[in-house]
Amino acid sequence: MRRRRLLALACVSATLLSGCSLLSSDDGDGRRTVTVWLMKSSASDDFLKRFTEDFEKTHSDLDLDIRIQEWTGIGEKVQTALKSDGGDEQPDVIEVGNTQVPQYAEGGKLEDLTLESMRDWGIRDWLPGLAEPGEYMSQQFGIPWYAANRVVIYRKDLFKEAGITSPPRTREEWITATEKLNQGGAQGIYLAGQDWYTLSGLIWDEGGELATGSGGAWTGALDSEEALRGMEFYQRLQKLGNGPVDADEEHPPQSGVFAKGRVAQIISVPGLATTILRENPDLKDKLGFFPVPGKTADKPGAVFTGGSDLVVPQNTDNRDGAIAVIEALAGAKWNTELARTMNYVPNKKSLAADVAGEEGVEAMAAGAAQGRATPSTPRWGAVEGDNPIKAYMTKVLNGADARTSAKEASRRITELLDPNTR
């Protein structure tokens, strides 16, 4: 509990005896300040200026103090803030990565926002890839703000050369098209062997999971039949290009590979096109985007959804103000405006049509409806740090037995999620 709250409670008691006036965190004019931590580059300066002006105009009792944070070291800084006893710089609202919510919610350090989510904020329409990791122990702590997910970036000119007139909509169409593209000195697709985010989507599309949880215990699940089918498709796709089997998409950066060679496709967030064009301006007007194809043409494939949620520290002394900020930032008006400004996907499936018109964002929004996130456990960070999924992928792509390798990787995931199994 924060110092200001304790002082205010003490003053309430003193009032009964001596007429002490209540302490408050207002600015002297009856307005209370809501301190908001947002991450660098999540929103433009112009957007934040317009939002602040509108919010303070429509909330006559509140002032906004938005403080921009760096991603480097943010985990430790947030944990410190959540344990603090107070101070005027203490945040009332914090932007966090969507998969980080459980580690902050553990131990009761965040406000439970389940009631507001169900009653006021349209929880059933939220993108699952943002909503699911925002839930911990059946309570909603993270409120979806914005999303970004992978699509296929492709060379329109190479598709035309190969006689492909429209992007594929199913996995089998995708394989057929990529086989046509993978000839004549061109790579059908550049897919690094350790792109586990893409593999995750293929596994989810098959009905599999990276890990399964029950009663707070988690078990690695890469050895399920569904997960093995996802890896099998990854193998088929990956061999239709020259991606390294022992590295991820950042080693080397796939934007540079795509920009400098005859590469027909990569899997990435649409924003990478800006980097590609900076490295090779000759590709202007030659880039296209389509959702990662699904098993059937009626819906895109599942994808890993990255993005941010908004949380309220349990030690805030201005819960009402924090709720008002989240209601505005995550509401339809400003959420759609943020998506248009920053080329994001809005937090609700019903808002996808509001960002139609930009090819990359449109493809991303279509895929986001099938978006997922990593298992909602505070210990998932340990899995990403050790990352037995990457090692498993490289083994299989080098010819190892998939089922045996998957069992080994699943066993390691279980150990990392539940140290008691060691």
Task: For the regions a language model picked out, list residue spans one by one.
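Conserved C-terminal helix/tail region of periplasmic/extracytoplasmic solute-binding proteins
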Residues: 160, 369-422
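Extracytoplasmic/periplasmic solute-binding protein
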Residues: 137-145, 150, 172-220, 226, ...
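A structural signal for short loop-to-beta-strand junctions that line the ligand-binding cleft
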Residues: 83, 89-92, 120-158, 187-188, ...
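Long, aromatic- and glycine/proline-rich binding clefts that accommodate carbohydrate-like moieties
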Residues: 129, 290-291, 339-387, 419-422
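Extracytoplasmic/periplasmic substrate-binding proteins
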Residues: 39, 232-318
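Hinge/lid segment of periplasmic solute-binding proteins
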Residues: 97-149, 175, 202, 288-290, ...
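Glycine-centered hinge/linker elements that transmit conformational signals in sensory
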Residues: 178-179, 217-247
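Extracytoplasmic "Venus flytrap"/periplasmic binding protein-like
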Residues: 54, 58-126, 161-162, 169, ...
